[in-house]
A protein has these predicted regions:
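Condensing-enzyme catalytic core mediating Claisen C-C bond formation in acyl metabolism
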Residues: 1-59, 154-222
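Generic secondary-structure signature for well-ordered alpha-helical cores
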Residues: 21, 74, 107-108, 133-136, ...
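Conserved catalytic cysteine-centered active-site region
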Residues: 43-46, 52-59, 89-139, 145, ...
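Short, surface-exposed alpha-helical segments at coil->helix boundaries
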Residues: 62-66, 96-100, 214
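Phosphate/pyrophosphate-binding loops at sites that engage ATP/ADP/AMP, CoA/4′-phosphopantetheine
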Residues: 68-82, 220-226
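Short glycine-rich or small-residue beta-strand-to-loop segments that form or flank ligand, phosphate
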Residues: 82-90
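Structural motif
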Residues: 85, 141-143, 167-169
Length: 226
């Protein structure tokens, strides 16, 4: 990242002050997945190029979020976030605030507001939209991390990788500012995972494309431009 100063300046603007990401060191070769499953899932051949990130046994959404947050604070010397939000659908604790663990590991003041958001991979984007639309005093630290378990021989096993990202939103020499946005909600189920289950259930990809991206997403883009 190439952030500017974290404090207000003459041309200070509210927006993204810095972004960082953290990926596990391990990589899974997609060709290795195909070699194991091509007898039953030959359609994976089209996805069997390259590799994806894979968390090790001692890594989870919290540890990856800590690393992403640590890199972000190093990029913004003197920045002390007043809030820390962790978005993930794979939080290691169901009844313990995961964001508080991250905040403690990052050395944030004990008065910082911490919260977990979950139930959808879109939760991180929703939190970012809220932070940009509703400026709050000080700097907001937004973290997102995932360590999803894909069903064997599924397209997700090829596509979904593990990792974390961190964003600082506040007033300063912003890398990017919020110009315009719109939202549209719909109970469109492209995939879902029931409570107590490890794997997602996904719908047919052409239906997701035609009924989801080409209808819902395009309508949202048009509404924003209007």
């Amino acid at each position: 990242p190439t952030p500017g100063p974290s404090g207000p300046t003459d041309d200070a603007a509210h927006g993204l002050l810095a972004t960082t990401r953290s990926l596990p060191r391990l990589r899974l070769e997609r060709s290795a997945v195909l070699a194991q499953h091509q007898w039953m899932a030959p359609g994976l051949r089209g996805l069997a190029k390259g590799r994806r990130s894979m968390a090790s046994w001692d890594e989870d959404s919290v540890t990856m979020a800590v690393e992403a947050g640590r890199q972000l604070l190093q990029a913004l010397p003197g920045c002390v976030p007043g809030t820390a939000t962790l978005a993930s659908t794979t939080l290691p604790f169901a009844d313990r605030q995961n964001a508080a663990i991250v905040a403690a590991a990052l050395g944030l003041p004990d008065g910082a507001l911490t919260r977990d958001v979950s139930s959808s991979p879109r939760a991180a984007l929703a939190e970012l939209a809220a932070a940009l639309r509703q400026p709050a005093p000080g700097t907001q630290l937004l973290l997102a991390a995932e360590r999803r378990i894909a069903r064997p021989a599924s397209a997700q096993e090829m596509i979904v990788g593990d990792g974390a990202a961190a964003i600082a939103v506040g007033c300063g020499a912003a890398l990017a500012t919020h110009v315009a946005s719109t939202t549209r909600h719909a109970d469109f189920v492209d995939h879902f995972r029931e409570s107590g289950h490890d794997h997602d259930y996904g719908w047919e990809e052409r239906w997701v494309r035609d009924e989801g991206y080409l209808k819902l997403a395009v309508a949202a883009f048009q509404r924003c431009l209007d």
